């Protein structure tokens, strides 16, 4: 809003020229979302308690019994903070801003439906797997179609760490893109099992993609770093910054011991939009690097289920996802969280190294 109303005044008052800079508006968007989350957080948590939106805890993890009743659906706070920040600082005529917001809100709506169902049934099982997958596929399909019909968008798959190595998937890029968004959404959802465990790596991934997206939208930087250039995409840097701010504000209350959980409304939306951001800046495979922690958590579940069926009842891990395995081995929750955060930061740095190793 500030960009649309104030930047035209720069021709008469040079001070307003600052609103044209993506870097300035990105920092402002981050701080706005962060402050909104921190200021409104206590009231929001109190409101959730009044509505009795308490989390139902997995019975197999005895150490989590004390967390029963902790308010959930904290992702709504992130959605509100993000929305206000975007309204103030983003260029509201930019189609990519609206597409990113659609993905975040769309996956969030599926998560909200799942969370509400859990609360109504008073157990830790929400909507059916088919219903959840159907909702995710619907949102991802719409988002991919919007990207695919864009003449500036390419169906080429970029291979990280290699100079100008691409594969044109053609129409197969559509289902591939849908898979990326849905897989990322569910991967973050699986990781959201300890206080602050999912939001920390999500913030790191969002920071990494904000850098890639800024470069993708800048013709000079994109040409120098051999990144596919897409005009207008740089504005999504503001979306990324606002999401980082909203995530940090949420982490203020979600850090161990958590006062609120993000719920599926938060985890599904964050994962889905991370997938979209990777597709938007043509760094689809880099998502597997910066989101390596999410990949490991997902693979642990796949291995556990496959091994259980193959051996007729034996388990490969003590419990899946992976963070529960470490819990049952006696590693303190706070130590697991910090170590996973450190791992995600290292993976983020590795992902950024793609820019120079090309």
Swiss-Prot record:
<dbReference type="GO" id="GO:0009252">
    <property type="term" value="P:peptidoglycan biosynthetic process"/>
</dbReference>
<keyword id="KW-0808">Transferase</keyword>
<dbReference type="Pfam" id="PF00953">
    <property type="entry name" value="Glycos_transf_4"/>
</dbReference>
<dbReference type="InterPro" id="IPR000715">
    <property type="entry name" value="Glycosyl_transferase_4"/>
</dbReference>
<dbReference type="GO" id="GO:0005886">
    <property type="term" value="C:plasma membrane"/>
</dbReference>
<keyword id="KW-0997">Cell inner membrane</keyword>
<dbReference type="GO" id="GO:0008963">
    <property type="term" value="F:phospho-N-acetylmuramoyl-pentapeptide-transferase activity"/>
</dbReference>
<keyword id="KW-0131">Cell cycle</keyword>
<dbReference type="GO" id="GO:0051301">
    <property type="term" value="P:cell division"/>
</dbReference>
<comment type="function">
    <text>Catalyzes the initial step of the lipid cycle reactions in the biosynthesis of the cell wall peptidoglycan: transfers peptidoglycan precursor phospho-MurNAc-pentapeptide from UDP-MurNAc-pentapeptide onto the lipid carrier undecaprenyl phosphate, yielding undecaprenyl-pyrophosphoryl-MurNAc-pentapeptide, known as lipid I.</text>
</comment>
<keyword id="KW-0472">Membrane</keyword>
<dbReference type="GO" id="GO:0046872">
    <property type="term" value="F:metal ion binding"/>
</dbReference>
<feature type="transmembrane region" description="Helical">
    <location>
        <begin position="165"/>
        <end position="185"/>
    </location>
</feature>
<dbReference type="Pfam" id="PF10555">
    <property type="entry name" value="MraY_sig1"/>
</dbReference>
<dbReference type="GO" id="GO:0008360">
    <property type="term" value="P:regulation of cell shape"/>
</dbReference>
<dbReference type="InterPro" id="IPR003524">
    <property type="entry name" value="PNAcMuramoyl-5peptid_Trfase"/>
</dbReference>
<comment type="similarity">
    <text>Belongs to the glycosyltransferase 4 family. MraY subfamily.</text>
</comment>
<dbReference type="GO" id="GO:0071555">
    <property type="term" value="P:cell wall organization"/>
</dbReference>
<keyword id="KW-0133">Cell shape</keyword>
<feature type="transmembrane region" description="Helical">
    <location>
        <begin position="233"/>
        <end position="253"/>
    </location>
</feature>
<feature type="transmembrane region" description="Helical">
    <location>
        <begin position="133"/>
        <end position="153"/>
    </location>
</feature>
<keyword id="KW-1003">Cell membrane</keyword>
<dbReference type="InterPro" id="IPR018480">
    <property type="entry name" value="PNAcMuramoyl-5peptid_Trfase_CS"/>
</dbReference>
<keyword id="KW-0460">Magnesium</keyword>
<comment type="pathway">
    <text>Cell wall biogenesis; peptidoglycan biosynthesis.</text>
</comment>
<dbReference type="GO" id="GO:0051992">
    <property type="term" value="F:UDP-N-acetylmuramoyl-L-alanyl-D-glutamyl-meso-2,6-diaminopimelyl-D-alanyl-D-alanine:undecaprenyl-phosphate transferase activity"/>
</dbReference>
<keyword id="KW-0479">Metal-binding</keyword>
<protein>
    <recommendedName>
        <fullName>Phospho-N-acetylmuramoyl-pentapeptide-transferase</fullName>
        <ecNumber>2.7.8.13</ecNumber>
    </recommendedName>
</protein>
<feature type="transmembrane region" description="Helical">
    <location>
        <begin position="335"/>
        <end position="355"/>
    </location>
</feature>
<keyword id="KW-1133">Transmembrane helix</keyword>
<feature type="transmembrane region" description="Helical">
    <location>
        <begin position="92"/>
        <end position="112"/>
    </location>
</feature>
<keyword id="KW-0573">Peptidoglycan synthesis</keyword>
<keyword id="KW-0961">Cell wall biogenesis/degradation</keyword>
<feature type="transmembrane region" description="Helical">
    <location>
        <begin position="70"/>
        <end position="90"/>
    </location>
</feature>
<keyword id="KW-0812">Transmembrane</keyword>
<keyword id="KW-0132">Cell division</keyword>
<feature type="transmembrane region" description="Helical">
    <location>
        <begin position="28"/>
        <end position="48"/>
    </location>
</feature>
<feature type="transmembrane region" description="Helical">
    <location>
        <begin position="285"/>
        <end position="305"/>
    </location>
</feature>
<feature type="transmembrane region" description="Helical">
    <location>
        <begin position="196"/>
        <end position="216"/>
    </location>
</feature>
<feature type="transmembrane region" description="Helical">
    <location>
        <begin position="260"/>
        <end position="280"/>
    </location>
</feature>
